[in-house]
Amino acid sequence: MISSVCVSSYRGRKSGNKPPSKTCLKEEMAKGEASEKIIINVGGTRHETYRSTLRTLPGTRLAWLADPDGGGRPESDGGGAGSSGSSGGGGGGGGCEFFFDRHPGVFAYVLNYYRTGKLHCPADVCGPLFEEELTFWGIDETDVEPCCWMTYRQHRDAEEALDIFESPDGGGGGAGPGDEAGDDERELALQRLGPHEGGSGPGAGSGGCRGWQPRMWALFEDPYSSRAARVVAFASLFFILVSITTFCLETHEAFNIDRNVTEIHRVGNITSVRFRREVETEPILTYIEGVCVMWFTLEFLVRIVCCPDTLDFVKNLLNIIDFVAILPFYLEVGLSGLSSKAARDVLGFLRVVRFVRILRIFKLTRHFVGLRVLGHTLRASTNEFLLLIIFLALGVLIFATMIYYAERIGARPSDPRGNDHTDFKNIPIGFWWAVVTMTTLGYGDMYPKTWSGMLVGALCALAGVLTIAMPVPVIVNNFGMYYSLAMAKQKLPKKRKKHVPRPPQLESPIYCKSEETSPRDSTYSDTSPPAREEGVVERKRADSKQNGDANAVLSDEEGAGLTQPLALAPTPEERRALRRSGTRDRNKKAAACFLLSAGDYACADGSVRKEGNVEPKACVPVSHTCAL
């Protein structure tokens, strides 16, 4: 809008006077820019920009500030964690100031995204924090530039690795009596065992013994849950090592006894005598193996009876190994007294199947972090292993064919097949030589004897070194990542349950803040979707004639609508999901809010009126608006 001074100057120019001065035009342009400017105070850092800049990304939180009267707001959470909007007063000219209690450093990147259209991720900010800030400001994470995408994804990759990696202290996180994670695990186990199986409740009298199930499960599954659990873990480790040692000693000649067995067969009037030799193991080794199997059986039965989820227990690979390693011993003991041919055949098969006992070595993964890290590394590096196998297969096929034809070059004319002077009779035999050469083993059982074959052998060795060297660094990086995560998680201090104070009630005198007690001049915040769905929350105020101050009072309907979500406590599964996903919202209150300018007045009837059109006792200044 052009001022009266410039209008008179313009009219004077038509009648022959001087044109409007440059100073006047600059003042008018400055006034127009001032009315378009907006000041955003984030965490105490003031940012100044134009409303047109904020409108470049419609549907976001800052776009709502640029057009507070627009009705096209998306149905999304408008509260956010720890957010509030307030008028800062001296916005300068016609501009206004909005305050948000968010991270000021991240907001600089967000505002720069509005200006340039390119969203970059700061390297000095933790990934989950940047993700939360993007969610609060209503920006999609897919808008992150490719140059910063790996930095942004780094935290999520670590979280995914933590999700599939059990805690290094045995699954329970080394939970102490007041450990929050340990309490959640125990609560989850009680829920899976049933409502009356926890030993506390109306039905605890009849099923009180079932209340020991979580404790027994932790005793045999979590070595760090108690001292008794550590003793059980040490005993299990001892029996595993003894069983593996016994298995190895059974194959030594010093522990094998040769026995001559005489068999007499009578068929009618004909009697035949047969002599055969049998090899028996020292009885002491059999007794030791029997004691170990008894321990493993007891451990297996206790764990399957007290497990929270039987289906998960049955599908666990280590539990399958336990069962397969225990079963042959009992079958062998049961069939040892039988003399039939079928029984002897079964016993012979069971003796061959004894090798499954060596699989008990994998049970050590429950007690050693490094073995668990190795297992997760192998699973995470499946693609790299497949790539390595494909490279080796291609190299073996190529060099086996080349060595076969290279060795035929030096064949004598009298040799029609051309393979009398070489070991490479055909291409399939060359496969073995190519594998041994590419893996740099070089047994020496087969080697080229012609100059062309030697050249192919040199190329095969070089190709093998390069082929194996390419995927190995990726596998090593995976192992390093998992190992560092395991060590970091093992050294993390235990999280104790903290006392969370109850939120102030609506009728509490500290719930609403006045201008004398609040450091801000007036209060702003964002419109939340619950407020849009249930209607605009009315702020009723009454004029107190005793002290002349305005007291903010909320209606009962509003109080019920605001306090109801606060009363819902998250379940243990939800708390675990929140910790795994990296969400670290500390404030769960999402309050209904208004974008009011300084000088507006909230009236008793719920309406908002501008300054200058205010009845004396009907409205109160926005500076006394409740800060939710």
UniProtKB/Swiss-Prot annotation:
GO terms for molecular function: metal ion binding; voltage-gated potassium channel activity. The chain crosses the membrane at residues 231-251, 282-302, 317-337, 349-368, 385-405, 456-476. The modification Phosphoserine is found at S8, S9, S15, S21. Belongs to the potassium channel family. C (Shaw) (TC 1.A.1.2) subfamily. Kv3.4/KCNC4 sub-subfamily. This is Voltage-gated potassium channel KCNC4. Glycans are attached at N260, N269. It is found in: Membrane. GO terms for biological process: protein homooligomerization; regulation of neurotransmitter secretion.
